């Protein structure tokens, strides 16, 4: 299954795509951006190539957008079960507090939701619907397993927050982790 929009193809990452996906993740990681650069959005999740590869093979958790005109990975969206992501302290913490939040009248939980993100699109491709294509594709991949998507957005990242609210994510509350404040957000997979 692949989605095509003009020259952009959205699909699951293959082993050969992982190094380029990692480069894109590093390009927009907060640790690699100066303060003014962060205004255009940033990611805070760090993964090695091996971890990305494991996420891809075990969870179908690495969705990429490729520009066919130059055969370049220009977007990515990660996602995985709370169990798979539990080695990351942030995700372990989020899983432990999910039931403190309600979405569509029910308490969130790890059994019926998955962790979405980060989502990352190369600056030169932003505003062209690539993020929406990544989200649409990932929802189809995870819908058979989970009815709800859960993500977090740093309060210092208004660009990301705007993307998520524009795409119907509901802000279900705040939480603090490691000295940062985050929005907890949710969306149905179908």
What are these model-derived regions, one by one?
Residues 132, 155-173:
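Conserved active-site alpha-helix within GNAT-family acetyltransferase domains
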Residues 7-23, 34:
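A short beta-loop-alpha structural element at the N-terminal edge
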Residues 78-118:
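Conserved acyl-donor/pantetheine-binding loop and adjacent beta-alpha core of acyl/acetyltransferases
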Residues 121, 127-140, 166:
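Conserved acetyl-CoA-binding loop-helix of GNAT-fold acetyltransferases
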Residues 112-116, 142-154:
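Conserved GNAT acetyl-CoA-binding A-motif
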Residues 50-64, 82-89, 115:
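A short helix-loop-beta-strand connector motif used in the catalytic cores of GNAT acetyltransferases and
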Residues 29-51:
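Conserved GNAT-fold acetyl-CoA-binding loop/helix
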Residues 117-126, 151-161:
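Conserved beta-strand-loop-alpha-helix junction that forms the acyl-donor binding cleft
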């Amino acid at each position: 299954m692949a989605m095509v929009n003009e020259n952009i193809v959205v699909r699951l990452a293959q082993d050969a795509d992982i190094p380029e996906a990692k480069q894109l993740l590093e390009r927009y990681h907060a640790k690699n951006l100066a303060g003014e650069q962060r205004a255009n959005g940033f990611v805070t999740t760090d993964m090695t190539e091996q971890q990305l590869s494991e996420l891809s093979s075990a969870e179908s958790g690495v969705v990429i957008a490729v520009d066919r005109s130059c055969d370049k990975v220009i977007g990515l969206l990660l996602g995985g079960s709370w169990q798979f992501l539990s080695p990351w302290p942030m995700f372990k913490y989020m899983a432990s507090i999910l039931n403190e939040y309600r979405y569509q009248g029910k308490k969130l939980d790890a059994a019926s939701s998955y962790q979405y993100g980060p989502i990352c699109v190369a600056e030169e491709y932003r505003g062209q619907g690539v993020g929406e294509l990544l989200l649409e594709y990932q929802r189809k991949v995870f819908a058979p397993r989970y009815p709800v998507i859960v993500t977090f957005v740093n309060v210092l990242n208004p660009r990301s927050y705007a993307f998520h609210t524009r795409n119907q994510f509901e802000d279900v509350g705040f939480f603090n982790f490691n000295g940062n404040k985050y929005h907890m957000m949710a969306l149905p997979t179908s």
